[in-house]
């Protein structure tokens, strides 16, 4: 078994952050990312980058963090007693993009690595990550492209991976109190540590690198569409679902806040503007109702693509 190489992972993640920020800034054309390097008292730190009030992106946050500690918090060892008494390191890149246009979907991606070590014992380690898409006004062509990209990057690693990680994503990004999916899903994986380090790292890199391939063509296709107040109002209302999921159900957000993580970085995923409306119902046969009818129910998007 080849042992994890933390320097190798860190180099990849910093490079991924650079690459994604460069692509987003280029697509925006007017705004730039501001960078903040921060240090965590208990160990480690990170590099947070945020772009606000752009021509295309209202807010885009791309975070790198590498935190470490002498012992894991209770919230982390409750489910995994074998981790108690081990020192740990957690590295990752996570991003959330909130475009201006209601015709551009919100997008989220994350790749991460975790290792817990103890002298004279094998380290416990795993990778996790994925990406998911949250449209307001859906386009079938975009949904098919998003899932086809996810399928293609999974294929070299196993025939069943796409369907397994797609289902995991559908199950994870589900807003239970609304009985509704957060978006159209994508990929989600966690606890990945077999068959060996190199294979797991290669797959995680494929997911990280695949994000731009999945998202940027959608941005290029839709960013020039005209929209008005009605579309904006619906976008802001649907962003409320994003906030509800992140603050009530998301494990990463809760873990970060409970373990004294950097609050500004954790809450960078929040949309800058959002609205709630009591008992909102979209009009029958409207463009808004199409989201609920055609996009949020779990769907085999690859099969949808074959019908064209």
From Swiss-Prot:
Its cofactor is a divalent metal cation. GO terms for biological process: protoporphyrinogen IX biosynthetic process. InterPro entries: Coprogen_oxidase_aer (IPR001260), Coprogen_oxidase_aer_sf (IPR036406), Coprogen_oxidase_CS (IPR018375). Its EC number is 1.3.3.3. A divalent metal cation binds at residues 98, 108, 147, 177. GO terms for molecular function: coproporphyrinogen oxidase activity; metal ion binding; protein homodimerization activity. The record marks 177 as: Important for dimerization. SUPFAM superfamilies: Coproporphyrinogen III oxidase. The active site is at 108 (proton donor). Pathway: Porphyrin-containing compound metabolism; protoporphyrin-IX biosynthesis; protoporphyrinogen-IX from coproporphyrinogen-III (O2 route): step 1/1. Substrate binds at residues 94, 110-112, 260-262. Involved in the heme biosynthesis. Catalyzes the aerobic oxidative decarboxylation of propionate groups of rings A and B of coproporphyrinogen-III to yield the vinyl groups in protoporphyrinogen-IX. HAMAP family: Coprogen_oxidas (MF_00333). Homodimer. This is Oxygen-dependent coproporphyrinogen-III oxidase.
């Amino acid at each position: 078994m080849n042992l994890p190489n933390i320097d190798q992972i860190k180099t990849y993640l910093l490079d991924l952050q650079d690459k994604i920020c460069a692509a987003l800034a280029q697509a925006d054309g007017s705004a730039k990312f501001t960078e903040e390097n921060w240090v965590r008292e208990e160990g480690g730190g990170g590099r947070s980058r945020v772009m606000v009030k752009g021509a295309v992106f209202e807010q885009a946050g791309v975070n790198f963090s590498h935190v470490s500690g002498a012992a894991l918090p209770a919230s982390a060892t409750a489910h995994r007693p074998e981790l108690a008494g081990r020192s740990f390191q957690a590295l990752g890149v996570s991003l959330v993009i909130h475009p201006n246009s209601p015709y551009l979907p919100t997008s989220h991606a994350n790749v991460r690595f975790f290792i817990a070590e103890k002298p004279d014992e094998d380290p416990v380690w795993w990778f996790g990550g994925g990406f998911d898409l949250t449209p307001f006004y859906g386009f079938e062509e975009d949904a098919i492209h998003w899932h086809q990209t996810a399928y293609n990057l999974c294929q070299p690693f196993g025939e069943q991976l796409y369907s397994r990680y797609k289902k995991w994503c559908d199950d994870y990004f589900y807003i239970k109190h609304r009985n509704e999916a957060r978006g159209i899903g994508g990929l989600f994986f966690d606890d990945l540590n077999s068959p060996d380090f190199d294979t797991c790292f290669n797959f995680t890199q494929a997911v990280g690198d695949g994000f731009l391939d999945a998202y940027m063509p959608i941005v290029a296709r839709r960013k020039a569409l005209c929209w008005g107040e009605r579309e904006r109002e619906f976008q802001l209302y649907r962003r409320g679902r994003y906030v509800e999921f992140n603050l009530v159900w998301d494990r990463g957000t809760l873990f970060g806040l409970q373990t004294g993580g950097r609050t500004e970085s954790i809450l960078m995923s929040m949309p800058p503007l959002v609205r709630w409306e009591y008992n909102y119902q979209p009009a029958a046969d409207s463009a808004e109702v199409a989201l609920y009818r055609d996009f949020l129910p779990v769907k085999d998007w690859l099969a949808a693509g074959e019908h064209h």
